[in-house]
């Protein structure tokens, strides 16, 4: 698996043959260069984009959302998949990470969250 694009220190786009893979892991992109072999021991999760739209959205996500929220969302999804014995669409990562960041920001600003139920 070779580095194709580095989003940040914790996320990169890799190529394995003709397959593009989004690789997540603490420090997986740190001191990497395009064309180098991905450090396997740093990989926590791999996503196999179905289309260019997902890769574009993920690129925007990594520039707008802290890695911790992506990591939390990834862990939540992995736990749910294991417990429910199912696979979720990879788009869930993008929406869930964004939602978590927004919820934390509201909480830190002490903005009320009303539940009308």
Locate the predicted segments by residue.
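A cross-family "folded-core" feature that marks the main globular domain of proteins
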Residues: 2-117
